[in-house]
Amino acid sequence: MPFLPEPLFQHGQPDRTAILLVNLGTPDGTSPREVGRYLRQFLSDPRVVEIPRAAWWFILNVLILPLRSRASAHKYETVWLREANMTGSPLLVYSERQAHALQQLLDAQGHDVVVACAMRYGNPSIPSVMQTLRKQGVERILVLPMYPQYSGTTTATAFDEVFRVMGQMRNQPELRLVKHFHDHPAYINALHQQVGAYWAQHGAPDFARGDKLLLSFHGVPRRTLELGDPYHCACLKTGRLLGEALGLQPGQYLVTFQSRFGRAEWLQPYTAPTLEELGRVGTGRVDVFCPGFPADCLETLEEIAMEGQSTFRVAGGKDFHYIPCLNDSEPWIAGLADIAQAHLQGWPLALPHPHVLEASRTRAQSKGAAA
């Protein structure tokens, strides 16, 4: 197997540390062709769809993509950002903002750590970003998937891709993995602050009157729970910890699951039918927050803020509020730094003195090294 090209080894070059923030992915644009290319890569992952490959290839390429690509392209068009300082997929825009803000915070704290973001599907890809980090002299990588709740369908496949790239490297960096942070105090605090800030600006629901807070997580097939995936339990724990932080009682907040795909049973209760039922019984106000999505994306901005609102109101509901995701809010960036630094312990976070590097280079060259 041929290995990836390696940067020329340089004596006296500092070994740097990097944090690689990994998210799900996004198409490069909103055309059906671009969206179809992204969906094909995403839905071809055997960790995402556990169906025999030959049968699934036919279903995906003949039955699903021809129709779903165009429908999804229209949905992406409704949320695509086209402002001067925010252009492109919301997920990519906010992911890059998170990486930039985390880089600034770590710089201000005196840490020499490179922060980069990559997507499991689409661009910037994990292979391309990892190669760029190697060219920057990175010898230690902390892989931090932006999935607070671990699942084999998300976190594990991000790790798979990192391992695949590592297998193609001649000179491999050290590697650490963050499996989850669904109950990390810094994450729960950031969620608490985000909801609290929204309520401070827009008013809080009247829970005594029967208003509700829905905590909507991305769904997965129920079969994954039965096969040992801990995702469901992690979502429930995040919901409970956030509810307690907000001072809510069970029943005032509800944990639901969205984005069901196909006919198989997924984790329940489903978000859309729950919103419909709350509207049908005349619930005065429903606030929806998506704790499992650290950055706003198609599933939050279109599926919840648009479709969810319509579902609730058409069924008879009155006041609908979508609470934005953590995105690049200050509490979340501070929390992200806390999570990362807990896993960086023991790794050098400062560059050696230039005199030390120069001495190393001089010694190597005296032994005949070219660089």
Curated annotation (Swiss-Prot):
Q: Which PANTHER family match?
A: FERROCHELATASE, FERROCHELATASE, MITOCHONDRIAL
Binding locations of Fe cation: 218, 299
**Pfam family of the protein (one):** Ferrochelatase
The subcellular localization recorded is: Cytoplasm
Pathway(s) this gene product operates in, as recorded in its UniProt entry? Porphyrin-containing compound metabolism; protoheme biosynthesis; protoheme from protoporphyrin-IX: step 1/1
Q: Which keywords describe this protein according to UniProt?
A: Cytoplasm, Heme biosynthesis, Iron, Lyase, Metal-binding, Porphyrin biosynthesis
Taking the first listed entry, what is the main subcellular location of this protein, grouped into a coarse class? cytoplasm
Q: Write the Enzyme Commission number(s) for this entry.
A: 4.98.1.1
Q: Name one GO biological process term.
A: heme biosynthetic process
UniProt keyword Transmembrane helix, yes or no: no
What catalytic activity does the UniProt entry give for this protein? heme b + 2 H(+) = protoporphyrin IX + Fe(2+)
Q: Which CDD domains match?
A: Ferrochelatase_C, Ferrochelatase_N
InterPro entries given for it?
Ferrochelatase, Ferrochelatase_AS, Ferrochelatase_C, Ferrochelatase_N
Give the HAMAP family listed for this entry. Answer: Ferrochelatase
Function description: Catalyzes the ferrous insertion into protoporphyrin IX.
Molecular function terms, GO-annotated: ferrochelatase activity; metal ion binding
One cellular component term (GO) for this entry is: cytoplasm
Presence of keyword Metal-binding: yes
Q: Report what the protein is called.
A: Ferrochelatase
**Family assignment from sequence similarity:** Belongs to the ferrochelatase family.
What organism is recorded for this protein? Ralstonia nicotianae (strain ATCC BAA-1114 / GMI1000)
